[in-house]
Design a protein with these regions (language model features):
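Non-catalytic DNA-recognition/assembly elements of restriction-modification systems
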Residues: 1-54, 68-71, 174-214
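Short capping/connector residues at structural and topological boundaries
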Residues: 36, 57, 67-68, 73-74, ...
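Structured loop/turn residues at beta-strand edges in well-structured enzyme cores
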Residues: 39, 91, 162
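Sequence-specific dsDNA recognition surfaces
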Residues: 42-53, 57-92
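A structural signal for short secondary-structure junctions
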Residues: 89-90, 114-115, 202
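A short beta-sheet element
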Residues: 95-143, 149-152, 158-162
Length: 214
């Protein structure tokens, strides 16, 4: 019964987060439709290339392509690697995108810092005010279609980094960006609360099952 209740509540929280993500996506699409001027993706972000030994990253969070779920569903779990491996050091609010077989649409808006391998592209907004906008831009199916249009290789296609940065994005005015960020911030806060609730339920489930099994 305890396990069923925890699973049921977690399922509700997952659906709530999916609905919140879809709501924000609809807002972004509507705002983008009203904007005529475009610019390159490189105008608001760049690739993170800083590398550290994995042992130097306090969170011990490791991400490879296997940890990122298809269809923009975030991560399934955190992986592990050797302490001496050099990894790309990502931070909270960076966007991680699997660069192997981009048609799987694997991406994650980082909720913590950590390290990722070379098969994962790490995008970082050039200014913090662009973080939520960057997330929404890379969330679009059109972005992944564009990446595939310049991908190299047949069996294991990879996106071309230079090509990706030429992706055309809407030029949000300061007022439009401010409005979007206010909504995005509210959505992100609610999603974070739901994630905390899911984690708490999972912890409670394990504690209760341990007690009952004695």
């Amino acid at each position: 019964i305890i396990k069923f209740i925890c699973i049921h509540n977690c399922s509700i929280s997952f659906r709530l987060n999916d609905n919140l993500a879809e709501y924000l996506n609809c807002i972004f699409i509507e705002l983008a439709k009203s904007i005529q001027e475009t610019t390159s993706l490189s105008a608001i972000c760049g690739y993170v290339t800083d590398k550290l030994a994995f042992s130097d990253i306090e969170t011990a969070v490791y991400i490879s392509t296997e940890n990122i779920l298809p269809d923009k569903q975030g991560v399934s779990s955190f992986g592990s690697t050797s302490a001496s491996e050099r990894v790309v050091h990502f931070r909270e609010e960076d966007v991680l995108v699997s660069n192997i077989r981009p048609y799987f649409k694997k991406m994650w808006f980082a909720t913590t810092e950590g390290g990722c391998n070379a098969d994962v592209l790490c995008f970082r907004a050039s200014d913090k005010k662009y973080s939520y906008l960057l997330k929404s831009i890379l969330f679009q199916d059109g972005f992944f279609d564009y990446v595939m249009s310049g991908a190299k290789g047949t069996k294991m296609p990879r996106g071309d980094k230079n090509h990706i940065m030429q992706y055309q994005i809407p030029c949000f005015s300061d007022q439009q960006l401010q409005k979007f960020n206010a909504l995005a911030s509210s959505v992100e806060q609610n999603q974070a609360l739901n994630r905390q609730e899911m984690a708490s339920l999972e912890t409670a489930k394990h504690m209760l099952l341990t007690i009952l099994s004695r």
